[in-house]
Design a protein with these regions (language model features):
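Generic C-terminus detector
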Residues: 284-307
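Phosphate- and divalent-cation-binding pockets in alpha/beta enzyme and binding domains
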Residues: 60-61, 130, 228, 255, ...
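Short, surface-exposed amphipathic charged segments that create phosphate/polyanion-binding patches used
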Residues: 87-99, 165-170, 283-287
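Conserved core of the sugar-phosphate nucleotidyltransferase
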Residues: 129-218, 223
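A C-terminal functional module that forms or caps the active site or interfaces directly
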Residues: 229-265
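Conserved N-terminal catalytic core of the sugar/cofactor nucleotidyltransferase
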Residues: 1-11, 28-122, 127-132, 140-141
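A conserved hydrophobic position in a structured secondary element of the catalytic/binding core
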Residues: 53, 220-221, 280
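Catalytic beta-strand/loop signature of glycosyltransferases that borders the donor
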Residues: 213, 268-274
Length: 307
C-alpha cells in the first residue's frame, strides 16, 4: 500500500472566529497552527500533505502559509472545496453559501490523495506530536478485511472546550477493546459553572462528562473511505435539499456513525499524550500563542519552524 498522506481541511469559513484563522499567525515567526501540524506530521513519517482550501482564499493562503511551506521538506499538494463541486444532476440551492461539510472536503481532495491511506485533520487545531506518531504507525499497517480498518485520535472533552463560547465535538462511545461503537456530532457544547453541557435547540441543555472521549476530526482511513463518501454523497444531498438546503453539512462523524451502524467499519480509538489547543474564537488565540511559545522554550520546536 502507498505511504500514508496527511489531509488538512483548511476551507472552512471561520464564522465563529471572525476571520481566516487558517492563516492567522500564532508562532514567533508568523507560523499558523497548520505549520506546526505539517512539522509534526513530517517528524512522524508523513512525506506528502494535501491542503484543502477554497479558491476564494487561495491568494491570501499562498502569500502566507503557502510561501512558508515551500521551505518545509514536506511535499505539498492543494485541493479546492467548492460549493458547485457536486455529482451530476445536482446544483447549488439558491442562497447557499455554507460549504457542504467535512466529508465533502475530503471528497474534493480525492485526486490529490490517490490510492493512499490518509490521516485527516483540521487546519486550526493543534493536535500534538504523539497524535501524528500513533496515527501514522496505525495507517502503515492498516488493512481492510471483513470490515474497513479505520482509526481516530481521541481527546478528553474537558481539555477541548473554551471559555469563550460554544464548540462542536463528536461525542464518542468506545468498547472495552478500544473500538468506537458510536459517535454523535454535538454542535453547541459549552462550559458552565457546574461542568459542561450541550443543547440542540438553544433552550434545553444536557450535561456531558468532562472525561468523555471526543473526536477533534483527526481521522485515519484506508483508501476505501473515499469510495464510501462518493457513494453516499447523493443520498445526503437528497435529504439535505429536502430538509435544510442552506445549512445541512455532510460531516465525517455522521458518515462514520452510519458505517458503524451498518457493521461495515471498525474504528480504533488511539490516544495522544499531548494536549490539544485550538482557536474556535479570536479570544482563544493568546492561550495558543503562549502554549506554542512554551513548547519552543522546552525544545519541542525550533524558534523558527522552517529556518
Amino acid at each position: 500500500m502507498a505511504q500514508p498522506v496527511l489531509v488538512v481541511m483548511a476551507a472552512g469559513m471561520g464564522s465563529r472566529y471572525g476571520g481566516l484563522k487558517q492563516i492567522d499567525p500564532v508562532g514567533s515567526h508568523g507560523e499558523a497552527i497548520l505549520d506546526y501540524s505539517i512539522y509534526d506530521a513530517y517528524e512522524a513519517g508523513f512525506r506528502t500533505a494535501v491542503i484543502i482550501i477554497k479558491e476564494a482564499i487561495r491568494e491570501d493562503f499562498m502569500q502566507t502559509v503557502g510561501k512558508r511551506l515551500e521551505r518545509s521538506p514536506m511535499e505539498i499538494r492543494y485541493a479546492y472545496q467548492e460549493l458547485h463541486d457536486l455529482p451530476e444532476g445536482y446544483s447549488v440551492p439558491e442562497g447557499r453559501t455554507k460549504p457542504w461539510g467535512t466529508s465533502h472536503a475530503v471528497l474534493c481532495a480525492a485526486d490529490a490523495i490517490g490510492d493512499a491511506p490518509c490521516a485527516v485533520i483540521n487546519a486550526d487545531d493543534y493536535y500534538g506530536k504523539s497524535a501524528f506518531r500513533v496515527i501514522y504507525d496505525y495507517l502503515e499497517k492498516a488493512a481492510d478485511g471483513e470490515k474497513f480498518d479505520y482509526c481516530m485520535v481521541g481527546y478528553e472533552l474537558g481539555k477541548t472546550v473554551t471559555d469563550n463560547g460554544t464548540v462542536a465535538r463528536g461525542i464518542c462511545k468506545i468498547d472495552a477493546e478500544g473500538f468506537l461503537t458510536d459517535i454523535r456530532e454535538r454542535t453547541r457544547i459549552a462550559k458552565y459553572p457546574g461542568g459542561i453541557h450541550f443543547t440542540e435547540d438553544g433552550e434545553t441543555w444536557e450535561d456531558l462528562p468532562k472525561d468523555v472521549t471526543v473526536s477533534m476530526n483527526f481521522w485515519g482511513y484506508t483508501p476505501s473511505f473515499l469510495q464510501q463518501i462518493r457513494e453516499r454523497f447523493p443520498a445526503f444531498l437528497d435529504r439535505a435539499l429536502e430538509k435544510d438546503p442552506l445549512k445541512s453539512e455532510f460531516y465525517l462523524p455522521g458518515l462514520i456513525s452510519d458505517l458503524l451502524t451498518e457493521g461495515k467499519a471498525s474504528v480504533r480509538v488511539l490516544s495522544s499524550t499531548d494536549r490539544w489547543y485550538g482557536v474556535t474564537y479570536a479570544a482563544d488565540k493568546p492561550a495558543v500563542v503562549a502554549a506554542l511559545r512554551q513548547l519552543a522554550a522546552d525544545g519541542r520546536y525550533p524558534d523558527s519552524l522552517w529556518g
